[in-house]
């Protein structure tokens, strides 16, 4: 239990760093803060996988209900509150926001913003839902994750535990290549908003989840040492901070 608390403490520290980085980015203080989104995606993929393994028998219904309560319901609530506040301003009409609001509630806002030529990095962006592209990708991932998890787990349990890890690693490589290719051939926003170019982060998290559950028990004892753990963890944090400080969206 103590190890589990320490484990989640490390994850909470990473989350806190990512949240602060995003905030500082939007305050024009940290130019690479937008990279924290990748960190959130990795954590989402990882935690989804680890949580699914905790269920003796994975339930699709239970998973979807959980995601509706934790992700979709709060998002929908914020959306309707935003629309209520917007309605108080006479120069802003609901009908102008209807297509965008629909895309938010149906989970395809990232593609809507892409089609509408929205620029996330434009400081004058006026949409109240400019940041909801991230939630759209999470919703799309949550829609397919149960199927991916069940298939990969069956392959791992029936044949070899390495198979899910290898498959997710291949998917990470494919998505990374797609990310790189589209960044060269397309507008940067096509790469930024596109679900397929973001899958590398999510599948990397899923891969780590399978590695954790299948191979966590055979990690050498020296790596489980609390001092070694802290050194690795804080080295990772330092690497993140360097990326957040020195990376800009054109790189």
What annotation goes with each model-predicted range?
Residues 1-7:
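Short, Lys/Arg-rich, polar N-terminal cytosolic tail immediately upstream
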Residues 7, 17-251:
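Hydrophobic membrane-embedded alpha-helices
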Residues 9-12:
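Short, Arg/Lys-rich segments that mark the N-terminal edge of DNA/RNA- and chromatin-recognition modules
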């Amino acid at each position: 239990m103590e190890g589990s608390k320490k484990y989640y403490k490390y994850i909470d520290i990473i989350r806190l760093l990512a949240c602060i980085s995003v905030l500082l980015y939007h305050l024009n203080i940290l130019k690479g803060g937008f990279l924290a989104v990748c960190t959130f995606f990795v954590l989402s993929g990882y935690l989804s996988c680890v949580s699914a393994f905790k269920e003796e028998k994975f339930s699709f219904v239970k998973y979807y209900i959980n995601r509706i309560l934790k992700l979709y319901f709060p998002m929908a609530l914020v959306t309707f509150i935003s629309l209520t506040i917007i309605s108080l301003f006479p120069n802003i009409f609901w009908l102008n926001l209807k297509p965008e609001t629909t895309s938010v509630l149906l989970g395809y806002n990232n593609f809507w913003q892409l089609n509408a030529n929205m620029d996330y990095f434009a400081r004058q962006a006026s949409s109240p839902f400019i940041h909801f592209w991230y939630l759209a990708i999470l919703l799309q991932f949550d829609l397919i994750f149960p199927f991916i998890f069940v298939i990969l787990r069956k392959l791992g349990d029936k044949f070899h535990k390495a198979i899910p890890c290898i498959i997710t690693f291949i998917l990470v490589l494919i998505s990374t290549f797609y990310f790189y290719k589209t960044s060269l051939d397309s507008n940067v926003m096509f790469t930024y908003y596109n679900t397929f170019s973001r899958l590398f982060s999510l599948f990397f998290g899923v891969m780590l989840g399978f590695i954790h559950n299948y191979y966590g028990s055979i990690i050498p004892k020296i790596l489980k040492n609390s001092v070694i753990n802290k050194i690795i963890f804080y080295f990772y944090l330092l690497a993140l901070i360097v990326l957040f400080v020195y990376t800009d969206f054109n790189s």
